[in-house]
Design a protein with these regions (language model features):
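Acidic/His- and Gly-rich active-site-bordering loop/insert found
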Residues: 2-89, 93-114
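Histidine/acidic-residue-rich, glycine-tolerant segments that coordinate divalent metal ions
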Residues: 57, 76-89, 94, 113-192
Length: 192
């Protein structure tokens, strides 16, 4: 396994560099979608794209049981060196790269015996509307377990540790008023 991972490193590094150097903002991730589509097809994966929005899905295996791995594909629109531009400062370039690397590793190991893996490349996470679009597209209808990952720009866990959920949050609808300065979802503790 270690040997194969070492063999994958140049490919994964190249994927990351491309994605990092070509960020696209929410609902404009068409070149990102095209790049991922071509990459996956070259590796022998089947891909489902959508006529009315960016993003894509790839499935491996067959059966009723489905485990999904989701990544966001959009970049932030922010000031970089005095000018506003798309920028992968939130880590979505790394998220996409990790999912693509996972797909290559699972393909090599041929670990699937029953059921299927679904890989979801979701647009517009930063706008908060891409997940709903994937639901409307029925991407999650057959999913039994859905996993995602998010890098943290500020280290809250020691290297090598992981939290089973968002370390600082919860998935619950709240109603109320918040007074203060806003902050990015990946850095809520920096708001006031």
């Amino acid at each position: 396994l270690k040997e194969y991972i070492q063999q994958l490193k140049p490919t994964i590094a190249s994927v990351y560099e491309y994605l990092h150097d070509h960020p696209e903002i929410s609902w404009k991730e068409y070149k990102t979608t095209e790049y991922i589509q071509h990459f996956l097809q070259e590796q022998g994966f089947t891909v489902q794209t959508f006529d009315d929005c960016p993003g894509l899905v790839s499935e491996v295996g067959t059966g009723d049981f489905c485990i999904a791995l989701r990544t966001d594909i959009d970049a932030l629109w922010q000031e970089v060196d005095g000018r506003f531009q798309a920028n992968h400062s939130c880590g979505h370039d790394a998220h996409m790269t990790m999912v693509l690397g996972t797909m290559l590793l699972l393909q090599k190991l041929n670990v699937l015996t029953e059921g299927k893996f679904k890989f979801i490349f979701q647009p517009a996470e930063e706008k908060g509307t891409g997940a709903l679009k994937m639901i409307e597209k029925h991407v999650l209808d057959d999913v039994d377990f859905l996993y995602g990952v998010h890098l943290r720009p500020i280290q809250e866990l020691q290297d090598g540790q992981a939290a089973p959920a968002i370390y600082h949050g919860a998935a619950k609808f709240l109603t109320g008023e918040i007074h203060g300065e806003d902050a990015h979802g990946a850095r809520p503790h920096l708001g006031q």
